[in-house]
Amino acid sequence: MKKVLVVICAILLFTGCSCSLNDTKPEEAVETFFEKYRAKDDDIITQLKDTIENEDLTDDAKEKYQELMEKQYDQFAYVIKDVKEENDEATATVELTVLNYKSAILKTEEELKANPEKFNDEEGNFSEEKYMDYKIEKMQEVTDTTTHTIELSLNKENGMWKVNQLSSDDISKLHGLY
């Protein structure tokens, strides 16, 4: 599931980097970048749905994944701590506070190790569906948060600042999976 969410998040982040007409400062581009997620921009949600639809999950699991991601978008917070600008390049240090989905994933993995039979089907075989349902259930219960610091790189193109592609670690941090 972590891989699924990272892929979903990566696609959304790559397309969420577009700038607005007002991004004449790096700070404004960073705000635009994060606010697209908080506002659940139509493009972001459409791409989220398209990405989830292509995953090998039950319809119920797909719906719950989308809800988890939207919950993260609703609840994450960010603070721009510092911006260093040099010519047409900038680096923004941002502190993110996100729902700690990683804690639920770790608990699910521990449960699998301790009680593997819990995830067996009627024939005694491991059921990926049961495991994923349990993992999603645990992620839905998450209320604790975690804080990470990420470094965003930006480039100035035609007078407008644009956030560059995030690293996979930063993508995981943004989505509470790190």
Positions of PLM-derived features:
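Primarily extracytoplasmic ectodomains and periplasmic/lumenal surface modules that are beta-strand-rich
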Residues: 43, 99-101, 160-162
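Short glycine-rich, low-complexity/disordered patches
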Residues: 47-52, 128-132, 147-152
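Surface-exposed, charged secondary-structure patches
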Residues: 63-137, 173-178
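Sec-dependent N-terminal signal peptides of Gram-positive bacterial secreted proteins and lipoproteins
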Residues: 1-21
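Hydrophobic beta-strand residues in large extracellular and virion-surface proteins
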Residues: 30, 78-80, 94, 152-154, ...
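Core segments of small alpha/beta cavity-forming domains
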Residues: 20-80
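Short beta-strand edge/turn micro-motifs at domain boundaries
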Residues: 114-126, 140-178
